[in-house]
Amino acid sequence: MTHNAPRTSLKGLKGLVVGIANVHSIAWGCAEAFKAAGAELAITYLNEKAKPHVRPLAEAVDATLTLPMDVENDAEVAAVFEEIEAKWGKLDFLLHSIAFAPLQDLHGRVVDSSRDGFNRAMDISCHSLIRLSRLAAPLMKDGGAILTMSYEGANRVAPNYGIMGLAKAALEAATRALSAELGPANISVNAISPGPIATRAASGILEFDQLMEDSVKNAPLHRMVTIEEVGALAALLASPAGRGITGDVVVIDAGRHIVY
């Protein structure tokens, strides 16, 4: 009997990676894994300040397109997908790895959060996934995969995480809704939930070093996960072998979340 198992290779597939800031970014670990698996990539950078940090990384993975995209700028977002359609005529997978909350709303109590801060955190951290998915789906003509990044703070009250926990909870709900709506087009939608990783975004969380120490102490594997491990998981979920998984939040945190 011959078994035709789905392939884990990304050879011949085209992917868009959103969220690289530097070599410590989770999105960078994912981009490296996508490239190693054979994908051709388009990579975005936030603004001119970020460009000199991101462009060398894009070149390192032979990105076909390196484009500016601030998700608060609808014209820039539309331009990215227009460039992808013009260059490739299709898109096979999308990685959304961005989040933001004003520091006072991140560090402060939720009950004290500002309306503007809450709205901006939700817009950048959650609704941007919806907007990108709306533009990506028509290009996924043969099906595809959409991935985003969450955190355990979506489900538990994490110290110094403020309204970001609410935004991540909404992001996970959006993941489920999008998976149901896009499933008929053979598009999977999943969130990956890594444990604490020392990224630039994480550096904005107060007492993050203590959070990492606690994670290492309590996780069954007694270590943190790496961006390379998160990237390997993302590559699996983006590949044909991972397309049977959808609407899920896949945790990769050295087992920390199972320990009370």
What are these regions (language model features)?
Residues R7-I43:
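Canonical Rossmann dinucleotide-binding motif of NAD(H)/NADP(H)-dependent dehydrogenases/reductases
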Residues A58, M69-A78, E82-K87, H96-N119, ...:
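Conserved mid-core segment of classical short-chain dehydrogenase/reductases
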Residues G183, S188, I245-G247:
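Short, small/polar-rich loop/turn modules that mediate ligand/substrate recognition or access, typified
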Residues S188-A198, A238, V251-D253:
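Conserved SDR Rossmann-fold cofactor-binding beta-strand/turn motif
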